[in-house]
């Protein structure tokens, strides 16, 4: 079997290097250039979507889709570096009270939802009450919103009481007026908080606060809402083959919107894009097709063949071929392919269910077990052998590109020390009593680590790194494969012992990562179900402070508590590269803005010439 795999890999590599710029059947069937063919953007996700309701989905891939259909009041400048918040449906940035507890947003008149039967043939204008309603939807228990923790920790006045009544079985009362979120007039709404939230406007720029029309929500049940997105954004869903393909077309009723992004001085690439695209009416691309291709080789070949226009995440196992020594391969450069490379504001990690009887708990023996697992695991092998150098070791969850990140901070989190791991296990009674080569629990019971995983190539490679790392210290680990959405559901419900997962920030604030450990966030951001009073106190305090030395000190304290109790083994922060064909115009990686479709163009003339 090893020889067959090796031969297959050599053949694939050879074909990749020799592949001409020929059109695939899918690409050649599409009219291009002067014959007036539509502009179509095609690419693939490596993980399946879970649905399209801002109140029900959390995963990175579904959030990227939602951002192109639903409009939050604010957004991010597409080309500015560092990132900058700008108005979207709002007429201007919010008016913020000096104590950061009141946020007043005024909307631009004349923005409309896409046509839908719920509106009974009438044009439906976006109004302030739509955002009030959309905020309240997250509090409705029937949606099980994975984002409710962001609002609950922000302490929106009056909403916890409405939610508490609904949690007891009563119908959720959308019509009850509350001080915390209310429309002041047709186009103005205000959010009022019980505590300061200096960075709350970042939430107003995220797609989970995209406007949902009440008429549509009342037309469908919660499951149907996942399949029937109706927003004011630039695109609408026209075809969905679950876990296979999604097709979107321009929203014909989309507002008058022009490209006015502003690059940062000294940013040559950003200035190039902004100058070329300035003043163009958005969106430009007529149609977007997103495919689900879990395996790396077919996803990459679809790009090389011209079937797909870009690859947002180059496959790790092909990184040495695509970006040898950190530079785009010469054969790709000759074809006009370009690359955009940067840190993703993210952390890859393995979680321990802190409520699980084997790996959970705060007692010294349980902490020792988790720390030993962390010390036994080889981050270097993961980054070097699996991710091909496209990551840096994590010392804490807080990622580059977010506040609270300190490149000088060093901790045990990144250490690989099997000898110390063995010593910890020995000291706390995790011994091999029956001579079968595996350690038992201190009471002599069977010790088997069970890690949830996915049936894809990357997961299988990571499984093997984990298996070898644990075997080196005589820990028995077994893997339980399931599709990613199923693992996500089970993790939120506290049904997994361990799971590897990535956490991606939607805003440039390290609070996103500290939220992984906040007790009240169990089942939402806090997949480990960690609940430590000392950590909860630190987390709650830092949320109310403006950025500065006092908040940085609390970040440091929180990081140390993560290391000491090890509810997660934080592994790495990704360095991600996107590659795109020369006919893709205006593309740039963006860590926080998800609605990229409307900012890019497909030059069909160039595509036709390249594929001729």
Regions found by a protein language model. Give the residues of each.
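Short Gly/aromatic-enriched secondary-structure transition segments
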Residues: 55-64, 120-126, 204-208
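N-terminal lobe/hinge region of extracytoplasmic solute-binding protein
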Residues: 44-98, 230
């Amino acid at each position: 079997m090893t020889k067959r795999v090796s031969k297959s890999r050599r053949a694939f590599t050879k074909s990749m290097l020799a592949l001409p710029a020929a059109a695939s059947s899918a690409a050649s069937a599409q009219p291009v250039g002067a014959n007036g063919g539509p502009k179509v953007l095609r690419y693939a996700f490596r993980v399946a979507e879970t649905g399209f309701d801002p109140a029900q989905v959390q995963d990175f891939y579904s959030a990227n889709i939602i951002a192109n259909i639903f409009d939050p009041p604010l957004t991010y400048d597409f080309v500015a570096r560092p990132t900058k918040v700008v108005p979207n449906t709002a007429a201007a940035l919010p008016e913020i009270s000096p104590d950061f507890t009141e946020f007043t947003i005024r909307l631009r008149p004349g923005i409309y939802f896409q046509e839908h039967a719920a509106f009974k043939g009438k044009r439906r204008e976006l109004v302030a009450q739509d955002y009030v309603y959309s905020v309240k939807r997250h509090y409705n228990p029937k949606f099980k919103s994975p984002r409710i923790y962001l609002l609950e920790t922000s302490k929106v006045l009056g909403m916890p009481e409405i939610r508490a009544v609904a949690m007891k079985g009563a119908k959720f009362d959308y019509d009850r007026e509350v001080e915390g979120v209310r429309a002041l007039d047709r186009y103005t709404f205000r959010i009022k908080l019980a505590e300061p939230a200096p960075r709350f406007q970042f939430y107003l720029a995220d797609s989970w606060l995209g406007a949902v029309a009440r008429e549509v929500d009342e037309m469908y049940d919660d499951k149907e809402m996942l399949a029937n997105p109706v927003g004011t954004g630039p695109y609408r869903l026209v075809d969905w083959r679950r876990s296979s393909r999604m097709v979107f077309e321009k929203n014909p009723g989309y507002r008058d919107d022009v490209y006015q992004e502003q690059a940062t001085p000294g940013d040559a690439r950003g200035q190039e894009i902004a100058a070329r695209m300035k003043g163009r009416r958005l969106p430009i691309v007529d149609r977007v097709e997103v495919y689900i291709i879990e395996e790396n080789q077919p996803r990459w070949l679809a790009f090389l063949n011209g079937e797909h226009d870009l690859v947002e995440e180059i496959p790790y196992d092909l990184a040495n071929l695509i970006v040898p020594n950190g530079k785009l391969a010469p054969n790709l450069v000759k074809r006009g392919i370009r690359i955009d490379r940067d840190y993703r504001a993210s952390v890859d990690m393995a979680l321990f269910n802190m409520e699980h009887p084997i790996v959970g708990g705060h007692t010294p023996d349980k902490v020792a077990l988790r720390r030993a697992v962390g010390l036994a695991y080889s981050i270097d092998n993961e980054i070097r052998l699996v991710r091909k150098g496209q990551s840096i070791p994590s010392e804490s969850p807080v990622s580059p590109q977010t506040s609270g990140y300190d490149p000088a901070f060093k901790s045990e989190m990144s250490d690989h020390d099997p000898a110390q791991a063995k010593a910890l296990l020995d000291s706390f009674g995790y011994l091999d009593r029956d001579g079968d080569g595996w350690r038992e629990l201190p009471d002599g019971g069977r010790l088997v680590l069970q890690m949830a995983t996915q049936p894809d190539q990357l997961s299988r490679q990571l499984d093997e790194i984990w298996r070898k790392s644990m075997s080196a210290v005589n820990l028995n680990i077994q893997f339980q494969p399931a599709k990613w959405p199923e693992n996500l559901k089970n993790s939120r419900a506290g049904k997994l012992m361990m799971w590897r997962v990535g956490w991606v920030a939607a805003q440039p604030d390290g609070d996103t990562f500290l939220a992984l450990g906040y007790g009240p966030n169990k089942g939402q951001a806090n997949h480990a179900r960690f609940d430590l009073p000392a950590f909860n106190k630190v987390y709650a305090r830092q949320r109310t402070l403006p950025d500065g030395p006092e908040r940085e000190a609390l970040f440091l304290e929180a990081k140390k508590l993560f290391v000491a109790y090890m509810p997660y083994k934080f592994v790495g922060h990704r360095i991600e590269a996107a590659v795109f064909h020369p006919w893709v115009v205006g593309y740039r990686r963006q860590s926080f803005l998800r609605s990229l479709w409307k900012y890019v163009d497909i030059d069909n003339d160039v595509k036709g010439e390249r594929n001729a």
